[in-house]
């Protein structure tokens, strides 16, 4: 079986959990990620990961080749100053996806705004009230436009607040 080639823009809790799931399921995979630091290799739960520098100012050009090889791409970097730097990167480098089976953009439930305690789902009206919600909704629209224009296999997940032992409202 060939290796699954995974590329993660950002490597926060959700991306780490995804990688840990692949490890637990004994999947044969290569993982490349981005960080704000200079490009380097790290050990993550007994596997080697290449971490490529990616910021709103500069990026390691090796990312382009890795994206062309990627089977799946996970985007967990939030908008910076109201702009999605990953979407801007994709727009500027239009021919980067060749073998990609899916691109997942991690958004947030803040795009729904205040529904006064009523249930919301993916068909609910989006009416964000926070700067975060507004920038996430704008990023979703940008990704949908890129997907339509370039036939990207896009899926958007709207996540609620993520809490753990390290990150929670009580600490």
Describe the function of each predicted region.
Residues 141-165:
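Conserved beta-loop-beta element that borders a ligand/cofactor-binding pocket
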Residues 6-11:
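Conserved N-terminal Rossmann-fold NAD(P)-binding element of oxidoreductases
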Residues 91-131:
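Conserved Rossmann-fold NAD(P)-dependent oxidoreductase catalytic core, especially the SDR/UDP-sugar
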Residues 15-16:
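N-terminal Rossmann-fold NAD(P) dinucleotide-binding loop
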Residues 46, 50-69:
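Conserved Rossmann-fold cofactor-binding substructure of NAD(P)-dependent oxidoreductases
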Residues 34, 103-109, 157-159:
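SDR active-site strand-loop-helix element
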Residues 32-38, 55-57:
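N-terminal Rossmann-fold cofactor-binding loop
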Residues 66-105:
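NAD(P)-cofactor binding segment of oxidoreductase domains
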């Amino acid at each position: 079986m060939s290796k699954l080639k995974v590329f993660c823009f950002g490597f926060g809790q959700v991306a780490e959990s995804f990688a840990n799931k692949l490890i637990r399921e004994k999947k044969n995979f290569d993982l490349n990620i981005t960080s704000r630091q200079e490009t380097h290799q790290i050990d993550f739960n007994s596997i080697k990961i290449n971490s490529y520098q990616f910021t709103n100012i500069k990026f390691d050009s090796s990312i382009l080749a890795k994206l062309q090889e990627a089977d799946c791409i996970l985007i967990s970097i939030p908008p910076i100053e109201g702009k999605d730097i990953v979407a801007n990167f994709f727009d500027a480098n239009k021919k980067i996806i060749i073998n990609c089976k899916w691109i997942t953009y991690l958004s947030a439930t803040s795009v729904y705004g205040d529904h006064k305690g009523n249930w919301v789902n993916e068909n609910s009206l989006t009416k964000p009230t926070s700067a975060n919600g507004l920038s996430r909704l704008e990023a979703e629209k940008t990704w949908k436009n890129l997907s339509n224009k370039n036939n990207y296999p896009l899926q958007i997940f709207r996540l609620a607040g993520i809490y753990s032992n390290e990150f929670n409202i009580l600490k």
